[in-house]
Design a protein with these regions (language model features):
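C-terminal "closing" transmembrane helix and its immediate cytosolic amphipathic cap
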Residues: 1-8, 300-317, 328-379
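Membrane-interface helix-boundary motifs at transmembrane edges
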Residues: 9-13, 76-85, 168-180, 232-245, ...
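Kinked, hydrophobic transmembrane alpha-helices enriched for aromatic residues
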Residues: 10-43, 60-68, 88-109, 160, ...
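Interfacial loop-to-helix transition and helix-capping segments at the boundaries
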Residues: 49-61, 142-157, 198-225, 259-294
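Transmembrane alpha-helical segments and their boundary/interface "anchor" motifs
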Residues: 54, 58-61, 75-147, 161, ...
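Membrane-interface transmembrane-helix boundary segments in multi-pass integral membrane proteins
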Residues: 54, 249-251, 276-287, 340-361
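Hydrophobic alpha-helical segments with transmembrane-like composition
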Residues: 64, 71-74, 103-110, 119-199, ...
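Alpha-helical transmembrane segments and terminal signal-anchor/GPI-anchor hydrophobic tails
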Residues: 237-314
Length: 379
């Protein structure tokens, strides 16, 4: 996610920078809706506009993973060199920010703030200001994120993809285009698994109480997006504007409708389980792929001619990892600010997204400009 490697001709692919810019905007937008409190989520305005806005932004993570595949596959370095370079740039800021987030509640107690201030920043967290709780969460970092660092789920995923890429690259280097297509087709079938397990049978294609790895397990997950990004860029797959309009737009609309109406129907049920609430928002599903692919193809066609715009997009692209790590510090205050505005809910969400992205990007850019230490902190 962080590093923008050169591709073939040793020139920066600004199209991928644009995709990363769109992805980070979408991610910020998703989290602006996530910060709505449990009480507010029961209100009709959230069920409608939160679903409408949040559904539109689901391609964020798949877009990031596709860019990662496009830039880094196949890995050309030795396994040790790749891990030393990539993982260190990822793991160090991940640990720094994970520790800081988990110390935040304890620090608010030291400063004399009420425990309720914690929920101004982390709506879903238990407001515990004890050092014991903070220490427990820090010790659990090697195993999973806490409710004070929810966004770090993606970093665990990214570390896993980085560990996997040198191994995956060995196959990619010798795989023909048809073999790559075969993998993508099988992966596409695996995208239906979440719905089949929910609406058909829990135990599917060999899964049972003693085996969680079913028939398509080895082709499933985000590695499909990883390969898809590589496949499109390195095989120079392009589509005409006409095909984008007649195929891409309907594809996006159908994917969006499935996501929106599915999520809205789930959130309308009182006491619905978290698993069902998130079902239609699951990233590795056909509806999210249907939204992601047209966006990736569209912004690959856009040419940025303005040096000012290009410079701005590249700056944001370089700051994406830092934005991901740090934006939760500013999310609560930004949301509290827009709550006071007398404007439509949809407008509030857009304002919150733009404000949060602007503040966080500026913060990350300034810290990175301080030198090597700043870049280690922000990635």
């Amino acid at each position: 996610m962080k590093d923008l490697s050169v591709i073939e001709n040793e020139k920066r692919n600004v199209g991928l920078d644009v995709v990363k810019f769109i992805a980070i905007f979408m991610m910020i937008a998703v989290h602006c809706t996530d910060n709505v409190s449990p009480a507010e989520r029961s209100q009709p305005w959230y069920n409608l506009w939160g679903s409408f806005y949040g559904s539109f932004m689901r391609p964020a993570i798949p877009l990031f993973v596709m860019v990662t595949g496009a830039l880094l596959l196949p890995v050309k370095q030795s396994l040790s060199d790749f891990y030393a370079k990539r993982l260190s740039r990822l793991v160090v800021p991940f640990l720094v920010w994970s520790v800081l987030y988990n110390l935040f509640p304890w620090i608010t107690g030291l400063l004399g703030f009420s425990p309720s201030v914690i929920n101004d920043f982390f709506v879903w967290a238990v407001p515990d200001q004890s050092f014991t709780s903070a220490l427990h969460n820090i010790l659990m970092i090697p195993f999973n994120f806490s409710m004070y660092a929810v966004q770090m789920w993606y970093v665990y995923l990214l570390i896993g993809l980085y560990l996997y890429m040198p191994v995956f690259s060995a196959w990619i280097r010798q795989a023909s285009v048809n073999e790559q297509r075969f993998f993508i087709v099988i992966w596409f079938i695996s995208l239906f698994v979440p719905y089949l397990r929910e609406f058909l049978t829990k135990d599917l294609w060999g899964t049972c109480s003693w085996n969680e790895f079913g028939l398509f397990y080895y082709f499933s997950g985000f590695n499909g997006y990883l390969l898809l990004g590589y496949y499109i860029i390195h095989n120079r797959i392009t589509v005409s504007w006409k095909k984008l309009f007649w195929i891409g737009v309907p594809l996006f609309v159908v994917g969006y409708c499935i996501t929106f109406f599915g999520f809205k129907s789930m959130t309308a049920v009182p006491g619905q389980s978290v698993e069902l609430v998130e079902l239609f928002f699951t990233y590795c599903t056909p509806n999210v792929l249907m939204m992601t692919l047209p966006i990736f193809m569209l912004f690959q066609k856009i040419r940025v001619n303005s040096d000012i715009v290009k410079h701005f997009v590249v700056i944001v692209s370089k700051c994406t990892l830092g934005i991901w790590m740090s934006h939760y510090l500013f999310l609560g205050p930004c949301y509290m600010f827009i709550e006071s505005l007398s404007v439509h809910t949809m407008v509030k969400l857009v304002i919150c997204t733009v404000l949060l992205l602007s503040i966080t990007c500026t913060f990350v850019y300034i810290v990175r400009r301080t030198g090597k230490l700043g870049r280690w902190i922000m990635g």
